[in-house]
Amino acid sequence: MEGKIGSIVAIEPSTGEVLCMVSSPSYDPRSMVGRQRSKNHRILTASPLKPLLNRSIMGQYPPGSTFKTTQGLTFASEGIISPDHTAFPCSHGFNFKGLHVGCHGHASPLSLVPALSTSCNAYFCWGLYYMMGAKSKYGSVQNAMNRWRDYMVSMGFGYRLGIDLPGEKRGLIPNADFYDNAYRGSWNGLTIISISIGQGEVNATPLQIANLGATIANRGYFYVPHVVRKVQDEPLDTLYRRRHYTMAKRQAYDYVVAGMRSSAVGGTCRELSRYDINACGKTGTAQNRGHDHSVFMGFAPMDNPKIAVAVYVENGGWGATYGVPIGGLIMEQYIHGRLSEASMKRAEEFQHRHIAYGNIGR
């Protein structure tokens, strides 16, 4: 993460143990002791780079297209889509009643697995539109919205996960009251369509996105992420040993895993195919006021996974530009205990690839 602002979080899916937590830029902790500690603290506090902010648990970002995995799980589990048979059109985006949400060029129409592989925006926009409009199933858009939110909360979003570190933020998952207040009760699926692709009012921490990767790796459950592996002569607190199951069905997870694997083989995460780790992944390009953030969420190997990773590089552009390569290198290092010669060169390349942050500087 040299010359970059962002975060990397890695979790062991089978235990919830945090394997890696990087927040960039960092600072030398030795500067916080001795006679100059007060002066140094003031300097760090005043820095526009915010080095004292642990972005892994305090940074709240749009999840971008990594969030499409949660949408596929929800729509499939609720019967809004049939993963094998429901196919939605995409003509360079979602186009309906004057609303346009852009997308890149790819085959159309698509079912769930190729929609995840290609990161199709239109597919998930259609899914949310039909869920919010299913009055015969939910009775009202408000009930549909709260049902959607319940799924997101069950997957670890909208509240603190409970990691054993101070300062964790909760992110944001809106409910029906949120939109009733914002739009005075006059809203529908089209009004909030951007949440289906991880934009709009949705925010998450890198820890929550890494936990999503661990949950998908486990096909439907997670452990509360924790830094402490064990305490001598004491059992680990039951809080960190209890499985938390989501509302999504196991079969829905199988389809999402297939989509993430397809993405790693020939989709938006195809960079992962250069690493011998049988990975599954999902890119994200999180829009914000400046340049887009480069986001990645994935795990490896596909079966009996050992590691789940989330990467956020602020203003890094496409998810495949920084997020996927960095995530792939971390997974390869952890699984094999080393990097191949080609990966070593790749790591050095990205170490020295700095991002210009305008007036902020480095």
Give the positions of each predicted feature:
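Short, gly/Ser/Thr-rich active-site loops of penicillin-recognizing serine hydrolases
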Residues: 237-244, 326-362
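Serine endopeptidase catalytic core focused on the charge-relay Asp
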Residues: 1-4
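Generic recognition of short, well-ordered alpha-helical segments
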Residues: 321-325
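Beta-lactam-recognizing serine transpeptidase/beta-lactamase-like catalytic domain environment
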Residues: 6, 11-66, 70-319, 354-362
